[in-house]
Structures are given as structure tokens and as C-alpha cells.
Amino acid sequence: MEKFQGYSEKHKSRQQYFVYPLLFQEYIYAFAHDYGLNDSEPVEIVSCNNKKFSSLLVKRLITRMYQQNFWINSVNHPNQDQLLDYKIGFYSEFYSQILPEGFAIVVEIPFSLRELFCPKEKEIPKFQNLRSIHSIFPFLEDKFLHLDYLSHIEIPYPIHFEILVQLLQYRIKDVPSLHLLRFFLNYYSNWNSFITSMKSIFLFKKENKRLFRFLYNSYVSEYEFFLLFLRKQSSSLPLLSSGTFLERIIFSRKMEHFGIMYPGFFRKTIWFFMDPLMHYVRYQGKAILGSKGTHFLNKKWKWYLINFWQYFFSFWTQPRRIHLNQLANSCFDFLGYLSSVPKSTLLVRNQMLENLFLINTRMKKFDTIVPATALIGYLSKAQFCTGSGHPISKPIWTDLSDWDILDRFGRICRNLFHYHSGSSKKQTLYRLKYILRLSCARTLARKHKSTVRTFMQRLGSAFLEEFFTEEELVFSLMFTKTSLFSFRGSHSERIWYFDIIRINDLVKPLN
């Protein structure tokens, strides 16, 4: 019992950080601007009349924030607030982006300090030798080959921004900072109603990438905290009530509502969490929960997650967002691949002295294939081919130089071939390569008002072949178990995070 109470207190320590005064420091906004320039994804810092970052604009912003009635008017009159009103002429677009970016940097400071002052624990291993996207498959083959069921989870988003603010109250006790966060979120939505339009969320995500990532990571870490804790303490669960270690701010009130639906839930032993072979993988807003348990056990996990999101985060998630499949009879979509674990029969001939034996051995093999239909459909949408896969020219590129046309087609072809070359069947890759090569030739022929045959005879097919087979730096990833909100001691569990440094753009629409 003392162990669980100490665990709760451990995560409540070092919360009294007052970070609000840092918003009045100029260097914070310089950091925010440098982050926008050095980010792996281009972040456009816009301003009125296309003005660039200026320390003078930041000083004006800080001067206005010192005004006594500035934030009061901003909250009471969000449609006419002094920060975003164009009638003032103080570069309102610049302020509306640079201030949330600076705020995101400030609120990240308590989490960085917590990581610095935490006692040194056992070093968390990092698999630095796995530097290729193709390392996923031997990794999954080693971990998932002996599992029976797989749950594919689409992690839901909270439909009300107030939920995200309440989650941060556990970690940040600086009340002015939380009120300022409400002010930012209030600008993008009607505060008294639920956000049912994805346009509002998309707008917030596009203009405030760092702040959106911070809020999303805090939400995911909170839900994973309970998932990992239940997984880690599964050996002790039959002895204690889960109410002992499910303590959180506001959660005690929601336990009552949960008890109405499931009376006696916290008094009974939750034995169904016990599973010695369970793996959890999160990537791109999705998660995979693999288990060797029974179908009944996995359904228990599914409904636990659904009710947990409903009664703890106060929003309903549809059961269809969690797909439960048996590995032997189905395949699953993972990072642009269709993966499966089919059973195959291997005939082994064994001879002992003069006797000959034939032994049939059933084996499992982790198989990965390229989704040909989806990729051809995406190329068709990008106007490289027809819906049936017939190559066509791309007229909008005919105004470019020959080298730019070759470079664009070459990059797409190499990226596709490198990323999907981990497939066990290469026929689809060669078909995609043929489509892009012929589409490139037809685009160049259309530009020079010639036929493909005449153009290829003049240019030579060897040049295209050499160009498309040119080597390029392959995408990198590493398997790590660290994160900003990592669960202490989780490195001894089967919890894996795929830290993908760069990913193929053509994979995103397929997911």
C-alpha cells in the first residue's frame, strides 16, 4: 500500500513552477522564431504585410501585455480583442502566432526541469543499430510472432479544449498560465459548445504546431499512464483494489459515475489485466495492442479503454475505433504496409540410419506486402496515372526545366522504392516504378511537343535508368522507450515507441 501511495506522491512533486513571468522576456519569442526556422517541418511565421521577425514587434507586444486591462478585454471580448484586431495595425497576425509559440516554450519548462532533477535510474536502452525503416519488420517478427490477437486502436481526440486544460492542472500549478491557455483556445472555438467541426482543430493545429503537439502529448501521456501502470502492476492486481493507485485530480469524482455503470468495479479484483505477453506500440496517432491471451481477455481491454476515455476524459469514443483481429486470420495496416502472420507448412526430410522420415512442421512467418491498390489510387489522384494504373503525363510540370522534371519524378520514385523495399513481394514496386518512369517520359515528350518513342531515342533510356536507380539517404528511425512524459520504470516492460525521424509523404494519405 505504501508503495502505491509513494508512487502517486512521486508524480505530484515539483509542480510549483511559476512560468507566467517568462512571457514578458524577449528571448522566449526569439526561441520560438528560431524553432520555426529549424523545425523539420516548415513552419510559416506570417505577419501583416509579410514582415519578418523583429525585436521591435516583440517589445510592442510585451508593452501591450503589461497593460492592466489587456487580458481582461481579450477574454471578455474575444471577437474584438486587442491582440487580434486588425484595426489597431500592430501586426496582429504576427502576434497571434508568435505568442502561442512562445507560450508553448514556456509551459514546456516545468517538464524539462522535472526530467533534469529526477534521480538517475537505470539507463534506458536505445536500439541505435536499428537505423532503417526496414528494421521494423525483424523487430515486429521477433515480438509479435508468438501473439494471437491484435487490437488496432485509433487514439481519439478530445472534442472540447477544456479537457486538455484540466489535464495540465495536474502538472502545472501556475494559474495565470492556464488562464492564458484558455484564452488561446477560446480564440479558435466557441467556449460554451463542443467542437464538432474538424476545421477548428485543423486551423489550431496548422497555426500553432508546437502548442498543439504539447497539448496532444500531454493528453496521450495521461491515458498511457494508466495503461502502463496497470500493465506494470498486473502481478499485484489480484491482491489490491485498483482505486488505491488510480488517484488523480478530478478522478475521484468520476469514480462515482463509473461505479453507477459498473457497481463494485473498484472493489473487485481486475484479474483480466493479467497477461504476461502483451505489447503496446504507438505511432502516428494510432496504437497497436498485441496479446497472447484469449478473445475474452482482449474484449475486456477494448471496453476498458472505451469506458476509461468516457468517464475519465469525459468524451465518447466509438467502439469501431478499436479493431480486434486474430493474427492468424487477418492482416493489419502498419506504416504503409499490410502485415500478417500466416501459418505455413514446411516439409522437412529427416534420415536416421536407414530410416527416412518426412515431418510436416507448421510455422508462423511475419509477412509484409505493399498495398498496391492504395498506392496506385494515390498516384492516380496526383495525376501520374489513371485509376487502372495506365501512366499519363503531368501537364502542370511542363513549365519546369527538364532537370527539375527529372528530379521530381526521381525523388518520388526513389522514396517509394526505398520505403517499401522491405516488402516480401517486389512486383508491386516494379509496377510503380514503371508508372513513374513512363509518366516522366510522357511529360518531357509533351513539353518538347514530341512522341515518347522519339524522345526516348534522342535522350536514351540508359540515362533514365541510371537516374532512377541513384542511391539516396534512406529514412531513419530508432526504437526507444523514452518520452517527455515517460512512465518511470517502463523500460522493463514491453512498451515500444517508434521515433521516426522522417517518413514518406506518400504514406500519410494511405493511413
UniProtKB/Swiss-Prot annotation:
* UniProt keywords, alphabetically: Chloroplast, mRNA processing, Plastid, RNA-binding, tRNA processing
Sorted alphabetically, the Gene Ontology BP terms of this entry are: mRNA processing; RNA splicing; tRNA processing
Q: Where in the cell is it found?
A: Plastid, Chloroplast
Question: What's one GO MF term for it?
Answer: RNA binding
Q: Which domain of life is it from?
A: Eukaryota
Chief location bin:
plastid
Give me the Gene Ontology terms describing cellular component.
chloroplast
Q: What family does the Swiss-Prot or TrEMBL record give for this protein?
A: Belongs to the intron maturase 2 family. MatK subfamily.
Q: What does this protein do?
A: Usually encoded in the trnK tRNA gene intron. Probably assists in splicing its own and other chloroplast group II introns.
Q: Which PANTHER family match?
A: MATURASE K
The protein's name is: Maturase K
Please give the organism. Answer: Agrostis stolonifera
